[in-house]
Amino acid sequence: MSAASSSSSVVLVTGANKGIGFALVSALLERDDSAKVVMACRSAARGKQALEELPEAYQARIFMLEMDVASPSSVSQAHKVLAESSDYTPLTGIINNAGVGFGKSVEETCATNFWGTKRVCETFMPLLVDGGRVVNIASASGPNYLSRCGDETRIQQLTDKNVTLDTIEQVYAEGLPSDQLGDAYGFSKSLVNAYTRYLSNKTKTKPNNIIVNSCTPGYILTDMTRGMGATNDPEKGVKAPMHLLFTDQDSIGRGWYYGSDCARSPLSEYREPGSKPYEDEEGC
């Protein structure tokens, strides 16, 4: 079975109990009355509370999964639980939405935003149908970080079409200079975008033909951005992820980073939503 031929979607959403993750759960279930969602939350109690805020008709199509993406043992246990559920596997899509925001150390930020994304991909992608989709939630902070980091070698490494996992992990190990420690969030998202490209190169060919992309949801008002000038409701943050999940495979890229307006964007500089989509030097 392929994602294109499957009769309904079964999508795993991490960080699903609030903010953009919760809005994605609602959007997925509203889009198709036969769709199912695996609602992955770090706290089972908070996940249950969020579940009860949804209409009863939606609740019947949700599989609650307790999972802390920053914990290898938690992710492993969650995979074991989900793999035993024939009603919610195989998956047609994975949305890596779980994340932490500004003001934390590089290690703590990347533990969730980068390593957590990588861990979920490696663990749950074997449950995807052929032609399944992976959407990694990134941020404009990633390109913004690269545009001002002043390190041309790092920019080249993280935007290389053929970036390797070894290179990405090497950049992480090098970390940030002392005067850039406030850029931990943007740094983590630049790693997510590079990993997205690496993973796409690895999985885009048959037999699995998995489509992997990343996107920014836009500047959305969530717990992460409260008090920082964000005003857009979480519901406005689902546009790009939904586009990457459901648009015909011939109409989207592979390993690309998309803006909140669903247009391709560069990895090393900010593109204003509504402006011309990015094209690299090969026009692809």
Positions of the model-derived regions?
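Conserved Rossmann-fold cofactor-binding substructure of NAD(P)-dependent oxidoreductases
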Residues: V69-T89
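Conserved hydrophobic beta-strands of the Rossmann-like cofactor-binding core
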Residues: V10-V13, P90-I95, V134
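Rossmann-fold cofactor-recognition segment
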Residues: L54-S73
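Catalytic loop of short-chain dehydrogenase/reductase
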Residues: G99-E107, D130-K206, T216
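Active-site Tyr-X3-Lys motif and surrounding loop/helix of classical short-chain dehydrogenase/reductase
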Residues: Q77-K80, K104-A111
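Canonical Rossmann dinucleotide-binding motif of NAD(H)/NADP(H)-dependent dehydrogenases/reductases
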Residues: S2-V38
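C-terminal helical subdomain
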Residues: R119, S214-P217, T222, G227-C284
